């Protein structure tokens, strides 16, 4: 395991792990530092939402867990962490491609294809967040996907060229770090999050138990309370 600093984050780099989130879960709270990263270039059992698995070819993508210990963040506002991570990934990807959006709750899309997945687990003490373990997978240099996932895509497939992973890591963490500075400005984060929601404009096909239908998404905005400013 190697330790180094990148863009204000302390990185613990492992050659291979089953899951960076699972490794982070095993660490005692005393060893979890704010803006700490557990990174691997070979994740063998990456976890997605529910029972899903995250496919990542060895040495091709970003697989990491970012640990936050936000000061005095109320448990009721824990979604601020999700918005920080999702918007940080969106900001990074938007440097390379257009049409990047966030699909509720934690996926990042380019057009109709998924390029990044996020899995966040919180430890709560009383009314506040003790720590947040933010698992992040971003498809960077993968040339093809072998799982039955319906719509994955990588920057390599979109750009037609490989990107240097260490530089990509630095850029991604810099974007996440800038968004983390907004962690206590919930309304500001929420406004950006809603503006970049997947399919927030236009008419699309949707499906429910009655079949396929066409509709547009309507966002309902409410006036924030003074506490949310």
Specify the residue positions occupied by each region the protein language model found.
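Single conserved hydrophobic/aromatic residue that forms the stacking wall/gate
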Residues: 221-229
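Structural motif
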Residues: 110-111, 208, 223
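Acidic (Asp/Glu) carboxylate-rich active-site/surface patches
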Residues: 10, 85-127, 137
């Amino acid at each position: 395991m190697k330790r180094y600093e990148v863009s204000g984050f302390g990185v613990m780099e492992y050659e291979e792990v089953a899951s960076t989130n699972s490794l982070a879960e095993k660490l005692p709270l005393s060893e979890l530092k704010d803006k700490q990263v557990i990174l691997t270039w070979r994740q063998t059992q990456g976890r997605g939402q529910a029972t899903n698995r995250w496919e990542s070819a060895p040495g091709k993508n970003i697989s990491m867990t970012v640990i936050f210990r936000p000061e005095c963040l109320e448990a009721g506002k824990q979604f601020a962490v999700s918005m920080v991570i999702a918007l940080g990934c969106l900001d990074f990807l938007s440097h390379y491609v257009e049409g990047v959006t966030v699909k509720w709750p934690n996926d990042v899309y380019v057009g109709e294809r998924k390029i990044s997945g996020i899995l966040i687990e919180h430890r709560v003490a009383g009314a506040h967040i003790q720590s947040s373990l933010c698992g992040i997978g971003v498809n960077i240099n993968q040339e093809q996907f072998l799982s039955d996932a319906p719509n994955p895509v990588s920057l390599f497939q979109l750009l037609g060229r490989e990107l240097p992973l260490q530089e990509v890591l630095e850029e991604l963490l810099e974007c996440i770090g800038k968004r983390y500075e907004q962690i206590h400005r919930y309304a500001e984060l929420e406004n950006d999050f809603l503006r970049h929601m997947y399919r927030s404009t236009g008419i699309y096909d949707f499906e429910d138990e009655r079949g396929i239908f066409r509709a547009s998404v309507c966002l309902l905005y409410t006036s924030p309370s003074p506490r949310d400013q």
